[in-house]
Amino acid sequence: AEAEVMISIDASPPDYLDHGATPNLIRMPAEGTRARWMTPSYPALTFPNHYTLVTGLRPDRHGIVHNTMTDAGIGGFRAADRNAVADGRWWGGEPIWVTAEKNGVRSASWAWPGSAASIGGVRPNRWKGFDDTVSPTQRIDDVIDWLDAPANVRPKLITVYLEQLDSAGHGHGRDSPQVRRTLGEIVPAIGH
């Protein structure tokens, strides 16, 4: 049986396909699928949008309304705070990996927002936490290892979060040489 792999290249608008360094992304729709368009949730920030993608709920319904927020009963939440992102009390709704696991379908996640927390007592069967020192190539190698596992332990649903393009864009500007170079590093990693 095949596996579903959902890869997010954070902050990658469709016109990045025109930068010329994306042959793997151009090839992928022929072998898999690609969204024709997306309407971001509001606010258009990483954590609210990524959790919306895996729950199907708007941020005001799943509770992750910003990358930084405060709740009088829980305290503060910052995307960079490992303890906060691992606290299941923040994460409402049911992400697809929880639904999969509840139905006997193994799942895995490489740093997808929400995957660090036990949600309803369930986490992905395999999981890697956010670590910006791990390259896109190593992350994809980990996914390949998951896919190469024996059938009885192989995940059938995998989510992978790649933040490098977003970081380069914030640091140097959307049309900077650094963004083009970062895109040129990420895309070959996905297709290797």
Language model feature labels by segment:
Residues E2, D10-P13, R36-M38, N49, ...:
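Sparse, context-dependent recognition of short Cys/His-centered cofactor- or disulfide-binding micro-motifs
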Residues A3-V5, R34, R106:
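A fold-wide structural signal in alpha/beta-hydrolase
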Residues R36, D81-N83, H192:
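Secreted, luminal/periplasmic, and some membrane-associated catalytic domains
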Residues L57-E185:
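His/Asp/Glu-rich, glycine-adjacent segments
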